[in-house]
Amino acid sequence: VSSGIAIAKAYCLIEPDLSFEKVKITDIESEKVRLKEAFKKSTLELEEIRDTAQTKFGDEKAAIFSAHLLLLGDPEMLGAIEVKISDGWNAETALQETATMYIEMFEAMDNDYMKERAADIRDVSTRVLSHLLGVEIPDFSRISTDVIIVAEDLTPSLTAQLDKTYVKG
């Protein structure tokens, strides 16, 4: 909540439908390829967003995306997801179960900084899941007129994309 008054059009953030069925699969290798493609698309997308954030907003906001890129490049997390795929689960299920495990682990920590990393994992896994499902997620960098954001929740990456030139509240 911000103090003051802002007048602009409402930009209602509607969460994309990222629901899926938990499915057992038989073609493990093609499922791993799907996962790696989703990771690759997410990486390219985050590199572009990071570079734009760097140019428009500076190092601090770009650092959020650099952290997300590190998560995407974490061989331990990717390996844990691939183990679940090898156990016969579809990539979506493997991703969500692995992300949930990491999120719960970070949220249980005593260190506030580490607890905040749970939001980063949630954000990155949502991006990868959107690519697995072929669903577009919101991109605030495309806003080019004055707006007031109306949303239940904003992820770290969405918040970092907010351009105060156009976002009035």
Q: Could you say what each language-model-derived stretch is?
A:
Residues 1-169:
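Non-catalytic, soluble scaffold/interaction modules
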